Amino acid sequence: MLKALEKAGILVEALPYIKKFSGKTVVIKYGGAAMVNDQLKEAVIMDVILMKLVGIHPVVVHGGGPEINGMLDRLGLKSHFIQGLRVTDESTMEVVEMVLAGKVNKEIVALIQRFGGKAVGLCGKDGGLIQAKKRFELVKNEGGARVPTDIGFVGDVVKIEPGLVRELADRGYIPVIAPIGVGEKGESYNINADTAAGELAQALKADKLVLLTDVEGILRDRKDPSSLISSLRIDDVPALVEEGVISGGMIPKVACCVEALQGGVGQTHIIDGRLPHSLLLEVFTDKGIGTMVLK
């Protein structure tokens, strides 16, 4: 009886959020452990389907780093690095596109269909969705100066054409997007999945951008999970970076959130994808589960 009452309480708590976000767009960056562990995969997919069933328009942008690395190893393609940055040559880009737009994307679509949802898989080339240009990374030369360096088919987003995604969502489908951009000459570019999700959220005028990660959120003390910062504002970010609270791989994720907020997205969230149903807990409960970044 106690468990039944708890479940009823959770449903009641979710009601105002369901009403608030019905008809709204939520862009979800899906990656990390939640893509590797079968139980977590199913939990994320069920969360996304439930969001759709209660009237929210979820849009999924996915990564696929481990799958790409596995396929490169299987094909015997060695990765070249410049100061820690992978150089994506033509052969590597072919594998990236094959794995992201083919294997990973269609697996997610099939899983959504299996659990009762309707999904359509896209990559950024479809309908000119993600238009991109070559990215030049600033890399230190022998003299210590940071100079623009060509790292291959890695791209920056130039423009998002969201019409196709919006139409699919309005027709009851869950769009699932592989972050492959298209250049002026039709060439493919590998786009960072966080960046692609943030840019798409802005173009769709999304109410929420949710980044699934392999950490609890932003912690004041990385060794203490209880030090989670449940919410912060853009103005708080510079000081937290200066203090080292936001550091390493969290810096580009927070920067993605800041840019999305400045581009008109309502709220952004960094949550722990290792926790089953973290997506629902963040969207539909009072306390949430990760870090919410607000304007």
UniProtKB/Swiss-Prot annotation:
Gene source species = Heliobacterium modesticaldum (strain ATCC 51547 / Ice1)
Family, similarity comment: Belongs to the acetylglutamate kinase family. ArgB subfamily.
Query: Which GO terms of the cellular component aspect does the record hold?
Result: cytoplasm
What EC number(s) does the entry state? Answer: 2.7.2.8
The positions annotated as site (Transition state stabilizer) read K29, K253
Q: What is this protein called?
A: Acetylglutamate kinase
Listed under GO biological process in this entry are: arginine biosynthetic process via ornithine; L-arginine biosynthetic process
Subcellular location, principal: cytoplasm
Which molecular-function annotations from GO does this UniProt entry contain? acetylglutamate kinase activity; ATP binding
Reactions listed under catalytic activity: N-acetyl-L-glutamate + ATP = N-acetyl-L-glutamyl 5-phosphate + ADP
Keywords, A to Z, come to:
Amino-acid biosynthesis, Arginine biosynthesis, ATP-binding, Cytoplasm, Kinase, Nucleotide-binding, Transferase
Cellular compartment(s): Cytoplasm
